[in-house]
Amino acid sequence: MSSYVGKSFSKQTQDASSCRMHTFDNYGAHSEFHESNYAYEGLDLGGSFSSQIPTNSLRREAINTTDRARSSAAVQRTQSCSALGSRSFVSTHGYNPLSHGLLSQKAEGNMEVMEKPSGKSSRRYQNGDYFSDKQQTNSTQRQNQSQPQIYPWMTKLHMSHESDGKRSRTSYTRYQTLELEKEFHFNRYLTRRRRIEIANNLCLNERQIKIWFQNRRMKWKKDSKLKVKGGL
């Protein structure tokens, strides 16, 4: 009985030792056994390359196919939307902004673009030119300012003929002529101070007073000569 127990115990110890030697001493078998645990996407962290897992590759292929299908569907949608938008815009307004630019005009007719009624101004695009209401109003205002209104009392009685080289003839009122005749009766030659005083009183200038006295003296001399000849 004791011999049987001893043999069985010796067999167990041998099996355990062989198992330990297999797990810890055989390094190559251990690395091969745990090879899949240390591999990350086909790259072995220990320095060796391992093959990819077939399940991961299948999943990636399926994901790639779905992404491609989604991208192709999105591209088709955008193309269809752009085509529809361009057709509708061309049909409604008569020109295609995608092919000819936003400001291109159809050769068959003219286009008029008006802003909202609440807008400040309206624009018209006709024959390649812009016309705005603001510009028209500004031009009219400038013309009105450049041409001031002339009232009748602002006009002169005798217009000047400066283009002909002649000066305008001054017209005197009845009151002015009477005052000048009184002054000429007392004094036929005026000083400059007296001439300025009369000009201020009669609302005339010094030159007009001087010319009137010169003409009056010439007339007086002519009359005096005629009287002398008639007396002889």
UniProtKB/Swiss-Prot annotation:
Q: Which ranges does the entry annotate as DNA-binding region?
A: 165-224
Which Pfam families does this one have? Answer: Homeodomain (PF00046)
The UniProt annotation puts the region (Disordered) at: 112-148
> Low complexity composition bias: which ranges?
135-148
Chain ranges for the short sequence motif Antp-type hexapeptide as given in the UniProt record: 150-155
> Which keywords label this protein?
Developmental protein, DNA-binding, Homeobox, Nucleus, Transcription, Transcription regulation
Q: Which domain of life is it from?
A: Eukaryota
Q: Could you tell me where this protein is found in the cell?
A: Nucleus
- Gene Ontology CC terms: nucleus
Q: Which PROSITE patterns match?
A: ANTENNAPEDIA, HOMEOBOX_1, HOMEOBOX_2
Keyword Metal-binding attributed? no
User: Glycoprotein among the record's keywords?
Assistant: no
One GO term in the molecular function aspect is: DNA-binding transcription factor activity, RNA polymerase II-specific
Q: Name one GO biological process term.
A: regulation of transcription by RNA polymerase II
Family note = Belongs to the Antp homeobox family.
What's the protein called, per UniProt? Homeobox protein Hox-C5a
Query: Which species?
Result: Danio rerio (Zebrafish)
